[in-house]
């Protein structure tokens, strides 16, 4: 199959493209591989996984801030259960190579959580964690 045909399948039927690319990899049929799009998709997978973990961390911080500062005891149990779920999902999805980037981005993640809480509650929250 020509590279143009492979690219067309990528653009029009992504699912079919994944099936064909996986088959070409299994068969080590390297001339049938759409290297450019494979590289982009692998990079996108990494970004997506990182984004999911960062989002879960932000939600956990958001709920911790609500528990500590919103003074809504009737909501605490729900918020705590949500935090447990976020933490379990983080643990499941976190890979060692994400940790340095999360540490680098932590201040921004924290600020996003603060912004979400302040959109709902009029509170004095710490500007840094």
Predicted regions and their residues:
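Surface/interface-facing alpha-helical segments and adjacent flexible terminal/loop regions used
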Residues: 1-58, 64-129
């Amino acid at each position: 199959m020509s590279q143009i045909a492979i690219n067309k399948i990528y653009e029009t039927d992504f699912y079919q493209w994944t099936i064909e690319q996986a088959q070409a990899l299994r068969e080590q049929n390297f001339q049938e591989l759409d290297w450019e799009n494979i590289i982009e998709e692998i990079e996108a997978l990494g970004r997506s996984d990182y984004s999911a973990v960062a989002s879960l961390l932000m939600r956990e911080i958001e709920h911790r801030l609500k528990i500590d500062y919103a003074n809504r005891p009737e909501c605490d149990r729900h918020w705590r259960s949500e935090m447990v779920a976020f933490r379990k999902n983080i643990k499941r999805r976190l890979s060692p190579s994400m940790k340095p980037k999360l540490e680098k981005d932590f201040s921004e993640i924290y600020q996003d959580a603060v912004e979400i809480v302040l959109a709902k509650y009029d509170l004095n929250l710490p500007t840094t964690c």
